[in-house]
Amino acid sequence: LQAPIGLHSTTAFLRALGELTGLDPEPFIEREKRTTIRPLWDLWRSMTQDFFGTSSFGIAANETYTRGLRHFLEEEMGLLCSFAFSRKPGVKPDNGAVRQAIQTSMPLIVFGRYNERMYLAEVGSRAIFIPASFPGAIVRRYTGTPVMGYAGATYVVQEVCNALYDALFNILPLGTELDKVEATPARRHKEMPWNDDARAALDDSVEALPVLIRTSAVKRLRDAAEREARAVGEERVTVACVARARAALVGGQAA
């Protein structure tokens, strides 16, 4: 038997343990449902439940955590898994593949080590980072953390809900950012036409982002691309304008 991660896995673990020991696990399971697991239903019924089916996550951790968290979040909770990398004893991890996955898939939540946190910072990602492996600046003294058992399952869902709230916060414009907007031109700009390949590049850039933040992201990128086109005297928005706008936005987030 291995220490379980997730609700169904924990229940199956306890029943298997009961068969091996000759003890009845059902009273304990029922008691846990009324106590330890009870907050989970409140978390599930919160406003963030609407985002579970469209929210994505990635994980890079040891094999037990990667397999367990992926099964729990993807199979039991309905989140979308963008990538999952397992670290095994005696096998050197492919950090390059992890970095590339983070840069290309751009999940909303990333479970991992300090390495993954650095990879997110490199591309200015707004993904929410949740520590799930070493090395990392991480303190785990409470019994519900790490993520094993019923207490761990409740803890993980709580962290995911908080991450979704943080993602919503990142969408909101800050007052200091609103103060930095360009002055209104004396002559109003007419709507700028887009080349088909430029619009396709815009769609591809937004498609790679989590559903929750696409609405705000597409507006920022579209406005930035049109500003780039006007700045260089283009009459239409080109692929190059979209690429420069995306690079500028990523660079600004990273700063």
From Swiss-Prot:
Pfam family name, one: PCP_red
InterPro entries (UniProt xref): ChlB/BchB/BchZ, LI-POR_suB-like_C, Nase/OxRdtase_comp1
Molecular function GO labels: oxidoreductase activity
Biological processes per GO annotation: chlorophyll biosynthetic process; photosynthesis
Protein name (database record): Uncharacterized protein in pufB 5'region
